[in-house]
Design a protein with these regions (language model features):
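Short glycine-aspartate micro-motif
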Residues: 40-44, 98-102, 166-170, 176-178
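Short glycine-rich anion-binding loops that position phosphate/pyrophosphate groups of nucleotides
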Residues: 20, 106-109, 172-174, 282-283
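Short beta-strand-loop/turn "lid" adjacent to the catalytic site in phosphate-handling enzymes
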Residues: 92-125, 275-280
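Glycine/GP-enriched mid-protein hinge/lid loop-to-helix segment characteristic of carbohydrate kinases
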Residues: 64-66, 72-76, 124-125, 132-147, ...
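Short, acidic, Ser/Thr-enriched surface-loop or helix-capping motifs
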Residues: 56, 111, 180
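Short glycine-/acidic-enriched loop or helix-start segments at secondary-structure transitions
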Residues: 112-114, 153-154, 178, 287-289
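ATP-binding/phosphotransfer module of carbohydrate and carboxylate kinases, centering on a glycine-rich
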Residues: 2-19, 23-68, 72-96, 203-343
Length: 343
């Protein structure tokens, strides 16, 4: 056994495994990276639902949970800490293996100092948010914009796999975009790149593709036209009605597509991207694809980008948080190993 392999084994970073069917059999001993050398926590800190998941260093998800909470940020953090304990019990992994956490926020996160601003949830912009989370979770915490993490996941495991340049447009309770250029997130100088909510601020509702505005548009149409749709005009029910050829449902989907295309338009015109991925509770509906593509083809004087729906659906944000967490955990694990070897 080489000294390098022995040191990795002593550090718990590799483990003995079964023989390779394609390799030699006589006296050979096989090793693999130990995915349980550490585990990471991913959190999608949404405005309505908080999603949590644990995964090992190989990216294997060991446990998941959803928390539906409308309480204060402090109450949500308490619920999050309780969820992590539940995840550890479910996964049967010891808590001391938890290496770090990545928390996705519906907010701008400064790339310089991690400061949170433009948050959809009151209290999320507290200056000590990361410290609150680290006290509750007892591990280092990284804060990141939720749409940025969705784009990371989509590039690694989704429809944008092996695509160097693309945009991810998340349309749900809020609106935001993430832009990947040459395989890297383009954050902007202050982390504000893709904050499309600021673009629609102060403008009329007929450019707003978010869930509340889409539901209100359905309610207005339902007051004048026959439909099977009923209050509160849930977005998913609207898309289901459109699939059943309900006239109001079809009209709402067409209008939602027009509004989404209005926000894809500047991305396509200024960045000349080959791909735009739609996600979120509104955006991730396949019924939007044909009308969005049609509107873009009509408006753009040059070929429109390919428009696709996220392959990961509502899991895109949490998957991105886990991917970022694994990257950070591997770096921390090997840094500690190097420090031990140097001392």
């Amino acid at each position: 056994m080489s000294l390098v392999l022995r040191s990795l084994l002593d550090d718990g970073l590799v483990r003995e495994t079964e023989h390779d069917p394609g390799g030699p059999h006589y006296g050979a001993v096989y090793y693999e990276a130990d995915p349980e050398a550490a585990v990471v926590l991913g959190v999608d800190f949404g405005s309505r639902v908080v999603r949590t998941a644990l995964c090992d260093l190989a990216g294997g998800v060991r446990a998941r949970e959803e928390i539906r909470s409308r309480g204060s940020v402090e109450q949500r953090i308490d619920a999050l800490a309780s969820s992590v304990r539940s995840l550890l019990r479910t996964s049967k992994l010891p808590g001391d293996l938890l290496e770090n956490a990545v928390v996705a926020l519906p907010a701008v996160v400064s790339p310089a100092d991690g400061r949170v601003s433009s948050a959809d949830l009151p209290g999320l912009g507290a200056s000590d948010l990361r410290e609150q989370l680290e006290r509750a979770l007892r591990v280092p915490v990284t804060l990141e914009n939720d749409v940025n993490l969705a784009a990371v996941a989509e590039q690694r495991r989704g429809i944008a796999h092996d695509v160097a340049d693309f945009a991810f447009l998340l349309v749900g309770a809020g609106l935001g975009a993430a832009v990947m250029l040459d395989w890297k997130l383009h954050r902007g100088h202050n982390g504000n790149a893709g904050e499309l909510d600021a673009v629609r601020s102060g403008r009329s509702d007929d450019v707003d593709p978010c869930s509340a505005s889409v539901s209100q548009f359905a309610a207005d149409l339902a007051a004048r036209k026959e439909t099977k749709l009923e209050p509160p005009f849930d977005v998913q029910e609207i898309f289901a009605a459109a699939g059943a050829r309900d006239a109001v449902g079809l009209a709402v989907v067409e209008e939602a597509a027009r509004r989404i295309a209005l926000h894809v338009l500047p991305l396509a015109a200024t960045l000349d991207l080959p791909l735009v991925v739609l996600g979120g509770s509104v955006g991730a509906n396949p019924a939007l694809l044909e009308p969005v593509r049609r509107w873009l083809a009509e408006w753009l004087p040059f070929p429109a980008p390919r428009v696709e729906v996220s392959a990961l659906g509502e899991a895109a944000v949490i998957e991105g948080a886990l991917a970022a967490g694994v990257d950070a955990a591997l770096e921390r694990v090997f840094q500690r190993r190097a420090q031990r070897r140097a001392s």
